[in-house]
């Protein structure tokens, strides 16, 4: 049975002891006299921790043992594509030619960096069937906001400012409604049919002269491919709207079908999902946005251009109707490097194979879990890259919720799936294994879910009180809001006052 390490680990500043040294600088060849102007000289002591290298390594190793990541084991968060991040990506991102350049350098001195951005754009254009990309957005939601801002500007530019409604299916990626609302649109929800795909009749009834566009995730968040996508595109375009592709689930269809060929006008991608760059710590991510030719003049500036005659890459600010910047400078460059390395290592056939295995893994897990007491599968049984089970029968019969199941999974040394999403599935367990887990890991995950089912019906309190073997037990969600402890100093002060007892 898994048991996570738990260390009573102080802050690195608290471990500091005066006089301890982790690194020494070489002596200068000659005496240097540097006079720092008074107005920029520090008034107080530079408070940096003083530790030896072994102490630093032990400190961060202990912290890592109380954590869990994609290198620890299966991490099947649905709609997140938590695949393994190849370490060659990190090697290339740490290359001095990447790590030590500055965005303010003259473009003549960063031709290699601009070439990387140019090549990445060519790959993304080919993969998606789009005509031009901006690499500026910092993440998926930032990409969504960029895309819907382009839609808004396009309609205003065409003399149709009344198009203020954005259609969003109830099975779309979760951030779509928020991004549309932030861009000033009224969000109209389109329901799913009994198969888990867009209800065409409802869509036809919803479109009109106020329709700006439809934001669609395909496959959707149930893991089901929208097989009537061509008809959906026809309905939206006939009404004068644009079709927006949320690339959250692109990992399911690489090399199989392209958004541009399905009728989409705009697409955003997540390099930190499909193209194996890290999700770590909330960023940095990257959410490139691609458009068809008729929308390229609305993209954020600058774009990266290539002068074939002079074999020179350059920053192109000649984008007449640009929506402006959506992030400072040019985007998260080191993330782009990682993604391009992944693309070049995998190649066309490798990407296609990755999607096939991702779909195979999701369907294998679905079939193995199907029929287990307490879990039911809504919609079509054939999935793409992810699957969504409902634990509603278990909740009704035992009182054990989807959240309880997720917490209990932690006791087996496995990361929980996404829970309570999509909202159209009650007590949802959204599982996306990705292509980088083995059959043995899938088998173990299913066995853990089956064992939790047995426990729910024989000894439900074991599940309801989980996790038992983690460094941190179940968090009090209510108290976390009422009395947040967001720093170590705050924790020590509250503990000294007796206001917390952990």
Curated annotation (Swiss-Prot):
Mind telling me which Gene3D superfamilies this protein's record contains?
Answer: 6.20.440.10, Aspartate Aminotransferase, domain 1, Type I PLP-dependent aspartate aminotransferase-like (Major domain)
Cite the InterPro entries for this sequence: GcvPB, GDC-P_C, GDC-P_N, GDC_P, PyrdxlP-dep_Trfase, PyrdxlP-dep_Trfase_major, PyrdxlP-dep_Trfase_small
Under SUPFAM superfamilies, the record lists: PLP-dependent transferases (SSF53383)
* PANTHER family from the UniProt entry: GLYCINE DEHYDROGENASE (DECARBOXYLATING), MITOCHONDRIAL (PTHR11773:SF1), GLYCINE DEHYDROGENASE, DECARBOXYLATING (PTHR11773)
Q: Which family does it belong to?
A: Belongs to the GcvP family. C-terminal subunit subfamily.
Q: Which GO terms describe its molecular function?
A: glycine binding; glycine dehydrogenase (decarboxylating) activity; pyridoxal phosphate binding
The EC number(s) given in the record are 1.4.4.2
Name the enzyme group at the top EC level: oxidoreductase
Q: Which residues carry this modification: N6-(pyridoxal phosphate)lysine?
A: 273
Lineage here is: Archaea, Methanobacteriati, Methanobacteriota, Thermococci, Thermococcales
The protein's name in its UniProt record: Probable glycine dehydrogenase (decarboxylating) subunit 2
Which gene does this sequence derive from? gcvPB
Q: Which UniProt keywords apply?
A: Oxidoreductase, Pyridoxal phosphate
Protein role: The glycine cleavage system catalyzes the degradation of glycine. The P protein binds the alpha-amino group of glycine through its pyridoxal phosphate cofactor; CO(2) is released and the remaining methylamine moiety is then transferred to the lipoamide cofactor of the H protein.
Gene Ontology biological process: glycine decarboxylation via glycine cleavage system
């Amino acid at each position: 049975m898994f048991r996570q390490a738990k260390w009573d680990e102080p802050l690195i500043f608290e471990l500091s002891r005066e006089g301890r040294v982790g690194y020494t600088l070489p002596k200068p060849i000659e005496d240097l006299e540097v006079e720092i102007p008074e107005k920029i000289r520090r008034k107080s002591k530079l408070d940096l921790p003083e530790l030896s290298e072994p102490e630093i390594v032990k400190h961060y190793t202990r912290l890592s043992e109380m954590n869990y990541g994609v290198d620890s084991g299966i991490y099947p968060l649905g709609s997140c594509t938590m695949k393994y991040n190849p370490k060659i990506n990190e090697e290339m991102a740490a290359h001095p030619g990447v790590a030590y350049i500055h965005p303010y350098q003259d473009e003549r001195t960063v031709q290699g960096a601009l070439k990387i951005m140019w090549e990445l754009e060519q790959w993304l254009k080919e993969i998606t069937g789009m005509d031009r990309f901006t690499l500026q957005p910092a993440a998926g939601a930032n990409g969504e906001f960029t895309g819907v801002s382009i839609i808004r500007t396009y309609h205003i530019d065409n003399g149709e400012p009344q198009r203020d409604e954005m259609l969003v299916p109830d099975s779309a990626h979760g951030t779509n409604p928020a991004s549309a609302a932030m861009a000033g649109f009224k969000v109209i929800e389109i329901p799913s049919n009994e198969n888990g795909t867009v209800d065409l009749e409802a869509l036809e009834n919803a479109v009109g002269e106020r329709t700006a566009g439809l934001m669609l995730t395909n496959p959707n968040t149930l893991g089901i491919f929208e097989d009537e996508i061509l008809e959906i595109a026809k309905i939206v375009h006939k009404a004068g709207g644009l079709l927006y592709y949320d690339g959250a689930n692109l990992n399911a269809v690489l090399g199989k079908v392209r958004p541009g060929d399905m009728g989409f006008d705009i697409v955003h991608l997540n390099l930190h999902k499909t193209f194996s760059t890290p999700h770590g710590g909330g960023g940095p991510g990257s959410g490139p946005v691609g458009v068809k030719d008729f929308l390229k003049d609305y993209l954020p500036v600058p774009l990266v251009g290539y002068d074939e005659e002079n074999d020179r890459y350059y920053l192109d600010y000649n984008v007449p109707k640009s929506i402006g910047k959506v992030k400072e400078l040019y985007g998260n460059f080191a993330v782009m490097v990682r993604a391009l390395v992944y693309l070049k290592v995998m190649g066309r056939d490798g990407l296609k194979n990755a999607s096939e295995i991702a779909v195979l893994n999701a369907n294998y897990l679905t079939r193995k879990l199907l029929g287990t007491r307490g879990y039911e599968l809504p919609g079509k049984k054939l999935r793409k890259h992810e699957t969504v089970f409902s634990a509603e029968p278990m909740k009704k019969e035992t009182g054990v919720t989807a959240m309880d199941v997720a917490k209990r999974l932690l006791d087996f040394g496995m990361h929980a799936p996404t829970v309570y999403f999509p909202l159209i599935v009650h007590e949802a367990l959204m599982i996306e294994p990705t292509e980088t887990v083995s059959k043995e890991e899938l088998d173990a995950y299913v066995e853990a879910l089956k064992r939790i089912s047995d426990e729910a019906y024989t000894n439900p309190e074991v599940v309801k009180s989980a996790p038992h073997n983690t460094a941190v037990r179940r968090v009090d969600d209510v108290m976390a809001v009422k009395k947040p402890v967001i720093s170590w100093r705050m924790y020590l002060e509250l503990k000294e006052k007796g206001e917390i007892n952990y």
